[in-house]
Amino acid sequence: MSNPNPATPPAPSWFAGFAAVALLGYAAFLGLNFSPFAGGSDSSGYLNAAKLLARGQLTAPPRDFAGLTVSSPTQLQPLGFIAEPARGRLVPTYPLGLPAHLALAGLLFGWTAGPLVVGVGATLAAIFLLYAIAREFRFVWPLAALGSVLFGAFPVTIFVAVQPLSDVLATTWVLAAFYAALRARASLDWAVAAGIALAVAVFVRPTNVLVLPALVVLLGAHWRSLAAFLIGGLPGALLLLAANAHLFGSPWRMGYVPVFEAFRLVYAAPTLLHFAKWLGAFAPGLVIVLAVAGFRPRSLSIRERLALALWFFVPFSVYACYEFSHEVWWGLRFILPAVPALILVALAALDHWLHSRPRLLAPAIALLLLWAVGGAVFWTRHFHTLLTKTYERAYADVGVWARTHLPADTVVTAHAESGALYYYTPFPILRWDQMSPAEFSAHAAHLARAGRPLHLVVHESEESSALNERAPARWEKVAALSQRTIWRYVGPAP
């Protein structure tokens, strides 16, 4: 097979050097602000799972609670885990794709540099792949470069790129699958690569399977291409199903909440308004207008337009019904793997409009570049995105302090800090937010009889709830740091 795409003029020789310098500068910006810490539920969940994989384990054995029995397994599970006391294990709730990347990078570069390599590397790869895809769609190099900048400057991209989260990595592997599918017109090897890339993308985020219809359309009706694509993706699909069966008891179950609970039509209306509001705010307004018009230009074939439409609208529509999509501005991260399709369609419209107006190419691109970069600066400051490292470091500081100052045989009870404490310490973790006062009193008495110290870690904002409502007792404050307080159990409440 030969690639039917007519060649576009190559970029000038100076562009490669300029792009390399720009990417290095962007990488330095992300690297300086990257948070490699196990903090809240997401970052600690991924890093805890990565540590297990690095040790050759899928699940963690229980830590020693001195024979404590509980009424609910949730009392024994740090954030990011499902506790199964009957089977003697903790099961990570997050998909294994990102933890596998983190585990490999952690073994090669250490657990501080490793997450940074994955996070920054995935972002740079996504930017490069988007440029390459735009060139495959026959856009001139300045437009392709504009598309990459639009993605890199997207405020949600920056927000997730400075944390050990799966969103950018999920997007990178989706982009790799689409690039390979476009190249598959020239070689069946690329169709196999597209299947492999999609399998990895689904390992990173299972809902990436939603881009499958778009890839099938892009590959076309050639049965050889589709068969090669299937050959590439099938081993990964079988491995994912086997992992699900081992971890969650069924090939079709995952660690997330059940699909029919998390995805409901009742969420669609508020989420669509939420998505429209923040896409309009974050993307240059002209990009949205161009994207709407971009399905008409003849610069794209009908098959290409259909593939781009499916790439964007299928994930967009499904996540519009997701319980958590409309809660915060960064809920847009759920549809980040679909955002490149929106950018590509906008580029198609711009390419069509500028075809007969070549003198306007440079001013139009300059305007959109300034708009995108200016918006990135404004929103990054507005949402204090670059303070993420400071916020997440607080969890690590508390974990390191606990490991170095608390007795080796202590049991720690915590809520928001539970995943981080599991990562940074060897202590058994109890969840005070999952207990009634009576249950806490019984657990504390059991641990006291066993001669085990008990400490409570809590954010200052939750002190009243923890100390007075959930875990009433006589407590002695032993430390205060990073807006958290650490308390030692002295005895039952008077």
Model regions: which residues?
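Membrane-embedded, lumen/periplasm-facing catalytic core of multi-pass transferases
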Residues: 364-417, 448
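Interfacial juxtamembrane loops and adjacent helix segments
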Residues: 51, 55-98, 102-108, 260-266
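Transmembrane-helix motifs of polytopic, lipid-linked glycan transferases
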Residues: 104, 114-138, 176
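Perimembrane helix-loop-helix junctions
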Residues: 180-187, 192, 210-237, 262-263, ...
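Membrane-lumen/periplasm interface segments of multi-pass, membrane-embedded glycan/lipid transferases
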Residues: 84, 241, 245-300, 320-321, ...
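Signature aromatic-anchored transmembrane alpha helix within multi-pass, membrane-resident enzymes
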Residues: 14-23, 196, 230-238, 301-305, ...
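Multi-pass, polyprenyl lipid-linked donor-dependent membrane glycosyltransferases
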Residues: 41, 115-122, 141, 146-176, ...
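Hydrophobic, aromatic-rich transmembrane alpha-helices
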Residues: 127, 217-220, 280-309, 313-316, ...
